[in-house]
Amino acid sequence: MNIFLTGVTVLVLTASSAVQAHDTESYEHVVATPIEINEQSATNVGQEYRYPSGEPVLLAYRIVVKPGQKTSWHKHSVPLFAYIMSGALEIDYGSKGIKKFKKGMGFVEAIDWCHQGLGVGDEDAVILGLYLAENSPDSAKPVICDGPQ
């Protein structure tokens, strides 16, 4: 029995190492490639975040920012995971600096921190936004700010 368990452990560890080395997992001929997330346990400006206390709801949006287009200064009151599907985006966080994101990058957006997005490059910045919101009207809607913090 011990030899069997040792063999299983070696196989599991070997398979685990192979998965980590290739950063993809295969299950029933379906390949799942992890999406790199900048600062997984904090927002991209270093804030800890918590899920909303009310009834949870996951909301998904396809957001498009044209080249040269600026968003208004705004902030989010709930956690938002953003994934850049195409193009590039520059976000001004005022005293926290400017961060650039391009196709294939993911991040947890700042919470209750005023910021402004700018579409950069020659193509639309297309973002998949997943809001971990509350099941209440406008819980995922950005709040307009006067300017940078």
Language-model-detected regions and their locations in the chain:
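A short beta-loop-beta micro-motif enriched in histidine and acidic residues
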Residues: 53-57, 68-81
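A short, N-terminal "cap"/entry segment at the start of jelly-roll beta-barrel domains
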Residues: 18-57, 143-149
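Short histidine-centered beta-strand/loop micro-motifs
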Residues: 71-76, 93, 118-120
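Short acidic-glycine-tyrosine-enriched beta hairpin
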Residues: 65, 95-112
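Glycine- and acidic-residue-biased ligand/ion/polar-headgroup-sensing regions
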Residues: 76-95, 105
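Bacterial N-terminal signal peptides
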Residues: 6-16
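Ligand-binding loop in jelly-roll beta-barrel domains
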Residues: 112-138
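N-terminal post-signal-peptidase region of extra-cytosolic proteins
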Residues: 63-69, 77, 113-115
